[in-house]
Design a protein with these regions (language model features):
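Enriched for short, Lys/Arg-rich terminal
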Residues: 67-98
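Basic, Lys/Arg-enriched alpha-helical interface segments
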Residues: 1-63, 97
Length: 98
C-alpha cells in the first residue's frame, strides 16, 4: 500500500477541486488513473524513478525519486514504505511549488 504525505493530499485535493469547479470530470478521472499507475509502478519497481522531473534537474534530492504518470509528475520517497510526496500537473510551476 502506498501512503501519501499531507502535502501530496493537499495538492491532489486542490487539483480535484479545480477540475470540479471547471466541470472537468474527465480530467478528474485522468488524475485518479495517473495515481493508480504511479502506485503500481512504485510498488513494483521503486528503483526505476528519475532523480528529478526531466525539465527540472535541480529538484533532485537524496531519498526521493520522480515518475511521470499520465500528465502528472509524482515525487515519492525511496526509503522505507512507499510514500507519495508530491503530485504536479506537467505544466505547473514545479520548482516554485516544491
Amino acid at each position: 500500500m502506498t501512503l501519501y504525505a499531507p502535502e501530496a493530499i493537499a495538492q491532489i485535493d486542490a487539483l480535484r477541486s479545480y477540475y470540479e469547479t471547471k466541470n472537468r470530470p474527465t480530467a478528474a478521472r485522468a488524475l485518479d488513473t495517473a495515481l493508480d499507475v504511479a502506485e503500481q509502478q512504485i510498488a513494483l519497481r521503486p528503483g526505476d524513478g528519475l532523480p528529478a522531473p526531466r525539465p527540472y534537474p535541480e529538484l533532485a534530492r537524496p531519498g526521493q525519486a520522480w515518475l511521470k504518470a499520465g500528465r502528472y509528475w509524482i515525487a515519492y520517497g525511496t526509503g522505507g514504505p512507499p510514500v507519495i510526496l508530491a503530485v504536479f500537473f506537467e505544466t505547473a510551476d514545479i520548482p516554485g511549488r516544491f
